[in-house]
Amino acid sequence: CIDPIDGTKSYVQGIPLWGTLISLSKKNKIILGLVDIPVLDERYIGYGNIAYKIFKGRKTELKVKKNKTLSKATLNTTSPYLFEDKKDQRAFNNLQKNVKSTRLGGDCYSYCLLADGHVDIVVESGLNPWDIRALEPIIINAGGILKTWDNKNISNGGRIIACTNKKVFNKCRSILNKKNPSKNCLLY
C-alpha cells in the first residue's frame, strides 16, 4: 500500500505534519511499514521485530511510553470532524473526558509520536487501508497496540485505536464501545 500524501489538508495548508506511507505485505500480513515526514527530516520504519526513527541521519530505536493510567494519558486525533457518525462523536468526547489532555491535527505523525513515546493514544474513524497499514509494524514493534474499535486487525482501515499498552487499550475500547454514550456533548 502507498499513500503518497497522508494529511493532504496539512500539505495544502503548509503544515509540516503530512507524510508518505508505504507498507509491504506478504500473504496478507504487513511485514514492513515506512513513514517519511520529509519537511521534518524524519523517517519511521518497522519490520521484523524492530522499529526505529531516522532523524537528520541518526537512527534511534522506538519505544512507546510506559504510562498505564488512562487519566494520565495524552490523546490525539487528526480532527473531531472525521467522526461523521454522531454516536462516534459522542464516544470520542466521552473518551476525551477521561484523559489528561487531547491534541488535534497530527495526521500520520500522531501515530509516529505514539511509537516514539510522546503520545499515549490515537483514535480515528473512517480510515482507508492506505491511511493505516504502514503504521502497524512501527507501532507494534515499538511495543504498542493498533486495532479497530472492535479489537480487529486494521488491514481494512475503519475506526482505529492505537495505544501504548493493553490496559489503556481495553479502557479506551470500553468507553468508545459503550452502548449509549452521553448525548449531551457533541464535538461540534
For each predicted feature, which ranges?
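Short helix-to-loop capping/linker segments positioned immediately adjacent to catalytic or ligand/cofactor-binding
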Residues: 9, 61-64
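An extended, acidic
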Residues: 63-188
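A structural micro-motif at secondary-structure boundaries
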Residues: 54-58
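Active-site glycine-rich loop that binds ribose-phosphate moieties when present
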Residues: 22, 60-61
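DPxDG-like acidic metal-binding loop motif
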Residues: 1-52
